[in-house]
């Protein structure tokens, strides 16, 4: 899933989040990409692609209990391998990855000197944490109708953070079935709409709003193919560059690192092929 998403976002000119930003800035091309991405994602969640996904892909899984691992977190794996306590393993893993990533990004002098990018990265990280807190703490409570403990306003019925593939699909569903009283504006839908709206406000404030379309029929064909790959791959990998690359990795889950590796491999491989 990650590999297909990486291929798709490269040939479509950007991931779901980037296309939402471009949509707010006036890109009709991104509007078409998002519509096809949403349709593909919805087909993978509940439609034609979903039947194949549920029948052939979902049953394939690694049974972590065979190694007495309680979950797929890296700290648990480190604790099991070294005998360290879970708290020590969590602290060590967090420090190693955090410091390693900081060393990697700050070795680039251009990035260090770009205060706007540094502050933007910090803000994105804080938003991921805030989203976990919002959906997992504030949005978690007792349903007054059933008296069961539930997560409110999330499509997955569990806590969520920033992600944009499935929310794009659910946004299309909500707009098409607006009168269905069982549907509601979830955290993911609100986040996707907020990104596009924020981009629109920024583009208008800085006078960068420009209408943009497709350059040619070939450009249209390529973008649509990439959008379909992103929709299928994003659902299959349970996240996109933001959903797995930031939100997922913040949980230190092995699956998120695998998905991120697939996204990077797919993107790099596609760019190499384009530049051949």
Q: Where in this protein do the model-derived segments appear?
A:
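Membrane-interfacial helix-loop segments of redox and metal-homeostasis proteins
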Residues: 1-276
């Amino acid at each position: 899933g990650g590999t297909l998403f990486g291929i798709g976002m490269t040939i479509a000119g950007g991931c779901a989040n980037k296309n939402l930003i471009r949509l707010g800035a006036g890109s009709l091309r991104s509007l078409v990409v998002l519509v096809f991405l949403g349709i593909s994602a919805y087909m993978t969640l509940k439609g034609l692609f979903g039947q194949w996904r549920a029948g052939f892909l979902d049953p394939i899984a690694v049974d972590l209990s065979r190694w007495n691992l309680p979950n797929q977190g890296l700290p648990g794996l480190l604790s099991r391998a070294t005998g360290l306590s879970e708290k020590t393993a969590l602290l060590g893993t967090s420090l190693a990855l955090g410091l390693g990533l900081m060393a990697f990004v700050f070795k680039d002098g251009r990035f260090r000197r770009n205060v706007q990018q540094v502050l933007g990265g910090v803000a994105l990280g804080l938003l991921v944490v805030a989203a976990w807190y919002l959906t997992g703490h504030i949005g978690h409570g007792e349903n007054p109708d059933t008296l069961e403990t539930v997560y409110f306003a999330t499509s997955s019925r569990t806590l969520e953070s920033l992600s944009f593939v499935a929310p794009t699909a659910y946004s299309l569903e909500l707009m098409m079935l607006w009168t269905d009283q069982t549907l509601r504006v979830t955290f993911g839908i609100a986040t996707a709409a907020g990104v596009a709206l924020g981009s629109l406000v920024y583009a208008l404030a800085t006078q960068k709003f420009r209408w943009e379309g497709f350059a040619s029929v070939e450009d249209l064909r390529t973008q649509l193919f990439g959008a379909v790959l992103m929709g299928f791959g994003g659902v299959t990998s349970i996240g996109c560059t933001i959903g797995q690359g930031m939100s997922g990795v913040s949980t230190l889950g092995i699956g998120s690192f695998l998905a991120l590796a697939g996204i990077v491999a797919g993107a790099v491989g596609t760019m190499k092929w384009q530049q051949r």
